[in-house]
């Protein structure tokens, strides 16, 4: 039986096949953050010199990309990316996701929005019938912490400060437990409209285009 780490590697390798299809001297690849994304980055190293470069969704990923000799570009200098590859903490059959366990949700959402296709890579344990067992992360302006927490409690959630964590943007993370997510796009829009919320970790208004889920029997592919 394959371990979870081996399944993550399988998913990362499957995403590299998409890179192979689009690779070229002018191509820029968007790259996410997290343990599965790290494996994708390590595999992407073989494309150094075959693609123009990358855009990273976090300082952590940028450092790992650079360590492999891959050029890391500022998103402001990029007009087109064919694919963005990232993991998920949860994903459902609609390709809606909860992301942000690593705290990079805002930059992940921004970089993903520029790419033509979002390719989600994960092991099969991340596929759920309904989102919400994994606490929903929110990036929040520090001065708004208490006000945002009250608004989330009114929605039925239990917000908890991620102690000692500061995002790459200088903000805090609230992890919200116990939210009932029956309509992910509606909840995403509602939470994002709370003053002080930079963004929430629901990726449903713009979810993944393709999910590559590693199973004991190979890759299961879901697409829109």
From Swiss-Prot:
Residues forming the catalytic site: 108
InterPro entries cross-referenced by the UniProt entry: NagB/RpiA_transferase-like, Ribose5P_isomerase_typA_subgr, Ribose5P_isomerase_type_A
MF terms in GO: ribose-5-phosphate isomerase activity
One GO CC term on file: cytosol
Keywords for the protein's UniProt record, in alphabetical order: Isomerase
Any single biological process term in GO: pentose-phosphate shunt, non-oxidative branch
Binding site for substrate: 33-36, 86-89, 99-102, 126
UniProt entry tagged with the keyword Cell division: no
Pathway(s) per entry: Carbohydrate degradation; pentose phosphate pathway; D-ribose 5-phosphate from D-ribulose 5-phosphate (non-oxidative stage): step 1/1
CDD domains named among the record's database cross-references: RPI_A
Pfam families tied to this protein: Rib_5-P_isom_A (PF06026)
Quaternary structure and partners: Homodimer.
UniProt function note: Catalyzes the reversible conversion of ribose-5-phosphate to ribulose 5-phosphate.
Family: Belongs to the ribose 5-phosphate isomerase family.
Listed name of the protein: Ribose-5-phosphate isomerase A
Organism: Bordetella avium (strain 197N)
Lineage: Bacteria, Pseudomonadati, Pseudomonadota, Betaproteobacteria, Burkholderiales
